Amino acid sequence: MYSSIVPSSSNGYYHQSQYQNAHHQHHQQHYHQQSHHHYNGAAAAPVINVHNYHFHTGPVNNQVIEQHYNHHNHVQQTFEENIPQGPHSSFNFSHDFPQQNNSETHLNHMEPSMTPMEHQNSGSSTPYPFEAKLFVPSPAASVSSYSFSSDLSGKDEEDPRIPLKDRGRVYHPQSTEKPKKVPSKRRDKATLDRLRVHKCFYQGCGKVYTKSSHLTAHERVHSGEKPYPCEWPGCSWRFARSDELTRHYRKHTGAKPFACKECSRKFSRSDHLQLHMKRHETDEQDDGMDDFKDFMTFI
């Protein structure tokens, strides 16, 4: 930075310039104080007079001083002409930003809600507004409206305990009571007494039968006659009835013609199969109780 060299003939000009600068600075401070009094939006900024700072990068002569003086007078005159006269008016934002007092006015001008498909078919250029919809289940959608049906195998359809209208659905017992047994095809005692005409006349035996073949087989028990021998090599067994021989012969061959429909087990005797089926009936009752408990827990 070079130091300013001012000739002695220009001292009077600099005294006048300093006086005008002080007057100009005082006038600006007074103007900003009045503006701060009428508008409290911001604090008054400090006044900086750029004309008080003289930076020269070279020697100073009379021509530079005259140019600076003329520029200073021009700036001061322009600033004084632009100063507004009279008290300053405060800012009023009411006419620039009208207030919406009624929120329903905006809602009344909104278009009625439309589905995305209806909005697309209407050909409107405006984007479809987002609508947050809450899913409310229907009161009719209760547990009772759900059906628990499924296809069953032939073993369930053949069960005579299930009514015809309920076949093809899952069987749930209506109560904890055991299902009533279907009466067997065996005849009652009165009917059998009328049909039993074949009586055994051995002393001390009063058995009667509906068929003569049954009476003949029974009489062989008293006489000890066994006309049906086993023909398997090395076997000397003899039987009084042919069905007993057939049953015995299966022990040699290993044949099991009586198969269970519920599982894969097979038996050589029909009475053994009947005993096995009773176990399945007990298991079905237990399963029915478990299904009933699960259903009651679900609802």
Swiss-Prot record:
GO biological process: regulation of gene expression; regulation of lipid metabolic process; regulation of transcription by RNA polymerase II
Transmembrane segments: none
Cited SMART domains: ZnF_C2H2
One Pfam family per UniProt: zf-C2H2
Record bears the keyword Plastid: no
Zinc finger (C2H2-type) stretch: 198-222, 228-252, 258-280
Tissue: Expressed predominantly in intestine.
Alphabetical list of InterPro entries matching this protein: Znf_C2H2_sf (IPR036236), Znf_C2H2_type (IPR013087)
Gene3D superfamilies the UniProt entry points to: Classic Zinc Finger
Location of this chain's protein in the cell: Nucleus
Keyword Transport set for record: no
Positions of region (Disordered): 19-38, 146-189
Assigned GO CC terms: nucleus
UniProt-recorded name of the protein: Kruppel-like factor 2
Record organism: Caenorhabditis elegans
Name of the gene this protein is made from: klf-2
